[in-house]
């Protein structure tokens, strides 16, 4: 069974037991969180779509770790004007492990 969930403005296809990284969620490491924005559920040949969410469907996940992604380098330049700008950015993330999919 799989589910398509929405968190942090992005959509993820998840399966029970899978680990994946999402935008930072303010939760303690080891705590269980419930993701209730389930857009679709699938099991074999049957797929259940929500409009926009599937009624009564939830995904239970455990917070594994918090961290920061690799640095993204930004470089801006205006030719012939002696203008150069360097900038870097590291996005925070939360790593989750799916415990169960209910619905």
Curated annotation (Swiss-Prot):
GO terms for molecular function: rRNA binding; structural constituent of ribosome. The keyword rRNA-binding applies. GO terms for biological process: translation. This protein binds to 23S rRNA in the presence of protein L20. InterPro entries: bL21-like (IPR028909), bL21-like_sf (IPR036164), Ribosomal_bL21 (IPR001787), Ribosomal_bL21_CS (IPR018258). This is Large ribosomal subunit protein bL21. GO terms for cellular component: cytoplasm; ribonucleoprotein complex; ribosome. Part of the 50S ribosomal subunit. Contacts protein L20. It comes from Herminiimonas arsenicoxydans. Keywords: Ribonucleoprotein, Ribosomal protein, RNA-binding, rRNA-binding.
